[in-house]
């Protein structure tokens, strides 16, 4: 016989197509562990409220642990009528312990039950993603530590701008992913509000002490203060999906840089064979597919966020079945990022850096700002210095030479006070060393930041 949690007032069975449309067990089965944890806690609250006796409580806990073990070892068998994970667990529990299982749902609705499940699950995946991000930060940091003084072109508008160090580039992404971790952990704080005991929407009238539930479910440190909001709130899912989407954006930016830098036109980096693929037609090809997939999959992370927000935007209080659509976007974003972050960390850790190609891409024009700064040091107002260096750039272009090759006579024609010492500006290492302000690209500053991050990340296990 089918086991459903509702149906007494219905005079005909659910249509087959409606069941396929409505049932969610095939995807919410991954909530089994948190659903059972919530049910064990609920059984404890029922015992304290005198709604079940010691024997019934022991049977419920024993049965729930058996169901948990079946899910863990893969022996759980779904049955007809397993509409969702809650129904499946209760059905199997009754098979194992008999009618005592019928008391488990006393005073509880699937509305507060699933809200609790989703909070527990989302806390878990946020912590997992935080760990994955840390691994990626460590991979970037290791590269930065090896290249604190490796000079490369820095870009604005994808045009060569000023020299920077490769270590500084790596640490830029360490900073990005640190903000992502901060967002996840900030979201976790708001997830730790317990809705269990809110009932379907109006609260519980059977004397269940909700405070006891926060002791039994130690992931939660406060109770929801309004039962209507408790069962209809999915802000925490939206927050995590936003965090995932922004992680995806940052991964996409990292991937785009690596794709460019690994191309023959740049040649700054080379991905390991293990994180590249080939062509079915062109034997010479080595494609950066790991990075291209990271870039491409960021789109689905953005889509999952928009999908949930679109579901939520028109819902009246309180629970509506639309909210079933919160799960698949969340699950998909987690699965995508959990694997994607592992790939990103490994690809970064194993890529080869080509300092000689970076050095070959440097050109004197990138030191035009240094030239203007030197004029400022000699008392020329910056706007005037900027204009004068612009004139020198134009003279060099007209002559078909670099700024370093431009004759001193041209420099003195633009700024009479200049002498041969102006050519000292044309030193890439000198240029980056002078960018010694806090957060700058100077090798000493990069080494300081590497040490700070090494200490921070190793103490963050």
Curated annotation (Swiss-Prot):
Name the domain of life: Bacteria
Q: Which SUPFAM superfamilies match?
A: L-aspartase-like
What is this enzyme's catalytic activity, as reactions? 2-(N(omega)-L-arginino)succinate = fumarate + L-arginine
What pathway or pathways are given for this protein in its record?
A: Amino-acid biosynthesis; L-arginine biosynthesis; L-arginine from L-ornithine and carbamoyl phosphate: step 3/3
Keyword annotations for this protein?
A: Amino-acid biosynthesis, Arginine biosynthesis, Cytoplasm, Lyase
The compartments listed are: Cytoplasm
Instruction: Provide a GO CC annotation, any one.
Output: cytosol
Q: What are the BP-aspect GO terms?
A: arginine biosynthetic process via ornithine; L-arginine biosynthetic process
Annotated EC = 4.3.2.1
Q: Which Pfam families does the annotation name? A: ASL_C2, Lyase_1
Molecular function terms from GO: argininosuccinate lyase activity
Q: Which family does it belong to?
A: Belongs to the lyase 1 family. Argininosuccinate lyase subfamily.
Q: What is this protein called?
A: Argininosuccinate lyase
Q: What's the source species for this entry?
A: Chloroflexus aurantiacus (strain ATCC 29366 / DSM 635 / J-10-fl)
Q: Which gene encodes it?
A: argH
